[in-house]
Amino acid sequence: MEMAPTMDLEIRNGNGYGDSGEELLAAQAHIYNHIFNFISSMALKCAVELNIPEILHNHQPKAVTLSELVQALQIPQAKSACLYRLLRILVHSGFFAITKIQSEGDEEGYLPTLSSKLLLKNHPMSMSPCLLGLVNPTMVAPMHFFSDWFKRSDDMTPFEATHGASLWKYFGETPHMAEIFNEAMGCETRLAMSVVLKECKGKLEGISSLVDVGGGTGNVGRAIAEAFPNVKCTVLDLPQVVGNLKGSNNLEFVSGDMFQFIPPADVVFLKWILHDWNDEECIKILKRCKEAIPSKEEGGKLIIIDMVVNDHNKGSYESTETQLFYDLTLMALLTGTERTETEWKKLFVAAGFTSYIISPVLGLKSIIEVFP
């Protein structure tokens, strides 16, 4: 692609509005970077589908040359140069590393990184299902229609306007997409819970019961039940989710609607639930939670695992940007939002809670303790 000579000359000479040619070229590069941002996701998706992380990992400690990778992938030799170009951007993004191979002269080889380790399909905390789920065309399609959606006067989400059904209804009608989504959420849960259980140990000591609201198929409930065998754990979710699931000694599944009733417990646990809902819906859920727990003096509290969006001047650029990406994903799929501390506080006060503590120990997410 080549710019028209007159346009290129105009940019280099400035635009007549006080902007220098260098400033305009920098602005142009900034725009191009965002135009092509989607390529990072697609390149990563391609690498995972080709099993490149597995090949590099299994070849350790030796680096894998391009020719060896072509052979391992069983792709046409004619596409070697294209594979090199794919790897080049993934090395630039930090997903793979490159090194000189001494025994092969100046030939280069590829090595895995910590990020690519988390993309291994058999890794207990693999992020591959999350990657493949969130870049699935069904999930991305609503974002193509944001501008049309903003002009609509109804209360449909972009997902509903695109696919003719809400996200949850769509999953009920397309089991394979529900499975993809559940796998995506499961991988996030496994990674986070390894930290949560360590960080929550002191927060859960002394309690006798806990209910995991919207706990799905019980990944969190099982982890807590195993880590705290003296705590009675209850997983609450809709009948179609938990109706056929069986518990264990200190774990049970209960069918129900969190907007109507939450089983009594010392602690109510909400992992990535409230960000799915708008403020009015969140307040309803929080009020049901407050009804389910004892007073603060008796040890009652909520534990919320969710995002607290960084203030403009706090947190790294990358982490804040990722939080904002999450927020627009929620806008596309559901009625929810990622919230700042101020926005969380308004919800807690409106639902009748008196205090809260935020512990930012989960990377992009935080542990929020809320007290009646």
Swiss-Prot record:
Pfam families: Dimerisation (PF08100), Methyltransf_2 (PF00891). Keywords: Methyltransferase, S-adenosyl-L-methionine, Transferase. It catalyses: (-)-pluviatolide + S-adenosyl-L-methionine = (-)-bursehernin + S-adenosyl-L-homocysteine + H(+). Combinatorially expression of Sinopodophyllum hexandrum (mayapple) genes of the podophyllotoxin pathway (e.g. DIR, PLR, SDH, CYP719A23, OMT3, CYP71CU1, OMT1, 2-ODD, CYP71BE54 and CYP82D61) in Nicotiana benthamiana (tobacco) results in the production of the chemotherapeutic compound etoposide. The keyword Protease does not apply. GO terms for molecular function: O-methyltransferase activity; protein dimerization activity; S-adenosylmethionine-dependent methyltransferase activity. It comes from the Eukaryota. CDD domains: AdoMet_MTases. One of its GO terms (biological process) is methylation. Induction: Transiently induced after wounding. Pathway: Aromatic compound metabolism; phenylpropanoid biosynthesis. Its EC number is 2.1.1.323. Mostly expressed in stems, and, to a lower extent, in leaves. S-adenosyl-L-homocysteine binds at residues 214, 237, 257-258, 271. The active site is at residues 275, 306, 338. It is an enzyme of class 2 (transferase). Homodimer. O-methyltransferase involved in the biosynthesis of etoposide, a chemotherapeutic compound of the topoisomerase inhibitor family. Catalyzes the methylation of (-)-pluviatolide to produce (-)-bursehernin. Belongs to the class I-like SAM-binding methyltransferase superfamily. Cation-independent O-methyltransferase family. COMT subfamily. This is Pluviatolide O-methyltransferase. It comes from Sinopodophyllum hexandrum (Himalayan may apple). The lineage of its organism: Eukaryota, Viridiplantae, Streptophyta, Embryophyta, Tracheophyta. The gene is OMT3.
